[in-house]
Amino acid sequence: MSWLSLIFGEKKSTASVAKERLQLIIAHERVGLSGRDFLPDLQKDLVAVISKYVKIDPDDIKVGLEKQGNYEVIEVNIVLPEMR
């Protein structure tokens, strides 16, 4: 390895650069397409798991997705029955 390659780095082939870019584009599109599609399944899973431990009404669990700045936040609200 020459000292020039240490300074400027190894030159990548155009095919490998194109492949990396395509992988990034595909990953970004997958995230964009499935953004809110998973929420109903997540809600069903939460109902199933919580129902193992506490008797709840499935309508008492609300799942939402909201954007806060650069982040997407999953908000989960669960109304639990009063414990005696």
From Swiss-Prot:
Belongs to the MinE family. It comes from Thiobacillus denitrificans (strain ATCC 25259 / T1). Prevents the cell division inhibition by proteins MinC and MinD at internal division sites while permitting inhibition at polar sites. This ensures cell division at the proper site by restricting the formation of a division septum at the midpoint of the long axis of the cell. InterPro entries: MinE, MinE_sf. Keywords: Cell cycle, Cell division. GO terms for biological process: cell division; regulation of division septum assembly. This is Cell division topological specificity factor.
